[in-house]
């Protein structure tokens, strides 16, 4: 039984979880995290490439194309401000570490998408947002009741109400202005210390917020789904078309 692939998958998953923790805590992921992840996994990848080269060199050219494609795509999305630098580096590293789609013990269960693993991770990451929206809607209908949904449907699908002391790592859908008037916005704003102090001053217990989750969390989710199931977006499109 070949344990190289699952070992590499586990190592990368641990690094991604660590990156999520750092991003949530300090909003920054040092470059050394990605360097260490490459150092820990490249020996396995190099050996796997050597094995493939003996059997079929054509696959190597396809793998090289996939790596170049993802590196360029990740950089382009970063330049377009679609996500942060850490997210781009994570995708680039995944492209290098997994030039071939990992296939072991019957996984992935559904498919391999277009055969470019990092691309499947990215597409899975994107569909996590609507899934989270349905989860928030279900939660809010139970916790807040259906009546409020008619007044503020956006808040029901994109946020939730929390106590003031738990605002950390959330953006505000509602806050108090300088005169103490309650303001509600469609685009959540990052809370300042002044905003938080004002809410406490007027003894506001709860406000509507949206989670300010770093995209690396979505990437980690997409990674796990790509390993176990495959490319979900590719599967959905194949069912429709």
Feature annotation, model-predicted:
Residues 1-241:
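A membrane-topology feature that recognizes alpha-helical transmembrane segments
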